[in-house]
Amino acid sequence: MTIVNVNDANFEQEVLRSELPVLIDFYADWCQPCKQLAPVIDSVAKKLEGKLKVAKIDVDRSPMVAQSFRVQSIPMLVVIHQGQLVGHQLG
């Protein structure tokens, strides 16, 4: 199971240029609901390894990416495929 830590610097390479669809988990270390969601994200990463890339983005450390997705509450999940937004879910 591989979960990639993505930030403002590597977002384009890890997400937009990914050949696989990417599930992005926008989170923050202080966010309790994010901590509760973490085991589910880990499970998805394990079950779909090789079919889906899972990326975690700390909104406090990557404000440019968070702002570009208009993240106003977390956790927020986003799916990107071939550089395009496919879907998103809050909470």
Task: Show the residue positions of the predicted features.
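Conserved Rossmann-like nucleotide-binding pocket used by diverse enzymes
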Residues: T2, N7, Y27, K53-A55
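Short pre-active-site segment immediately N-terminal to redox-active cysteine/selenocysteine motifs
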Residues: E19, Y27-W30, S73
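A short beta-strand-turn-helix
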Residues: I3-V22, P63
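Non-catalytic, surface beta->alpha helical segment in thiol-disulfide oxidoreductase systems
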Residues: Q72-G91
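The canonical Cys-X-X-Cys-His
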Residues: C31-C34, L77
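Hydrophobic beta-strand anchors of alpha/beta hydrolase catalytic cores
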Residues: L23-I24, V54, L77
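Structural microenvironment flanking redox-active thiols in thiol-disulfide oxidoreductases
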Residues: I57-A66
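Typically the conserved alpha-helix immediately C-terminal to a functionally engaged Cys/Sec
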Residues: P33-E49
